[in-house]
Regions:
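Small, basic N-terminal interaction modules of short regulatory proteins
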Residues: 1-74
Length: 74
């Protein structure tokens, strides 16, 4: 899993797998879900993140988190 936040775009991208994206659906304004060919969720994109994050959580700069598969399985 990989999580990236771009402060200039105020967008967060959560990549759940490395599968190729076949199609995307905007399920709500600013929330886009990406699916593979078998309709499994591959990624989530969230726009206007600062408007959606409630206190006490804040996002002040660029963020990137990588979680290798073996760490998830532990």
């Amino acid at each position: 899993m990989r999580i990236r936040y771009d402060p200039q775009a105020d967008a967060m991208y959560i990549r759940l797998s490395e599968a190729e994206i076949e199609h995307s659906d905007e399920v709500e304004a600013g929330i886009i879900l990406d699916y593979d060919i078998e309709d499994r969720l591959v990624a989530i994109e969230i726009l206007d993140v600062r408007k959606r994050v409630a206190p006490p959580f804040t996002i002040k700069g660029e963020l990137e988190i990588d979680m290798p598969a073996q760490a998830r399985d532990a």
